[in-house]
Design a protein with these regions (language model features):
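Short, small/polar residue-rich loop motifs at catalytic or cofactor-binding pockets
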Residues: 155
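Cleft-lining beta-strand/loop regions that shape enzyme active-site pockets
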Residues: 1-152
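C-terminal regions of proteins
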Residues: 148, 158-160
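Amphipathic beta-strand/beta-sheet edge segments enriched in Tyr/Trp
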Residues: 160-166
Length: 166
């Protein structure tokens, strides 16, 4: 790992600590730097320890995209519909790991591609508020199959994106 990755990790970690301290442990924080298959591990690592808090911040600022927006949205859409209360211990509920609190998503001008799709899906599905600045604006599927003679790559829009209204 290079120094830039380590600085980014520190930035992410300090955001998590700040949220935890400012909310006295009542709000969880999950940052996803991208939406690739490898980022599923980050989701598991960061979401499950905070799934039972009163609030959740999902930070997709600087998100480079990928293709797991639907997978994460599915996890956030889960709803508990009944509960178990043991004589001793904590209440549990069906739809294990269903988040039951308030949620927001943070975006910025560096939120790109599938990070934008995630934020738009979050908003359209009524999961919570999207907060931040206008995103990158490239919520399109790109292809990198256009390899040049010098082995460089030209990315070009391959699929446009639109909502149910057209």
């Amino acid at each position: 790992r290079d120094a830039a990755d380590l600085r980014y990790d520190e930035w992410e970690y300090t955001r998590r600590l700040e949220v935890d301290e400012a909310s006295q442990g009542q709000i969880g924080y999950v940052h996803l730097r991208a939406m690739g298959g490898g980022n599923v591990t980050e989701w598991y690592r960061d979401f499950y320890p905070v799934f039972n808090r009163q609030g959740l911040i999902v930070d997709v600022r600087h998100n480079r995209g990928g293709n797991i927006d639907s997978w994460i949205l599915e996890k956030l859409m889960r709803r508990a519909w009944f509960y178990w209360q043991p004589r001793v211990g904590r209440t549990t509920w069906n739809m294990q790991w269903a988040f039951r609190g308030h949620m927001v998503v943070l975006v910025d001008e560096w939120t790109a591609s599938d990070g934008e799709a995630f934020a738009e899906g979050f908003r359209r599905l009524g999961l919570g508020q999207v907060i931040g600045t206008r995103t990158w604006g490239g919520e399109i599927w790109l292809t990198s199959s256009n390899v040049l003679v010098d082995r460089g790559i030209v990315t070009a829009a391959e699929f446009g994106v639109f909502g149910p209204e057209g």
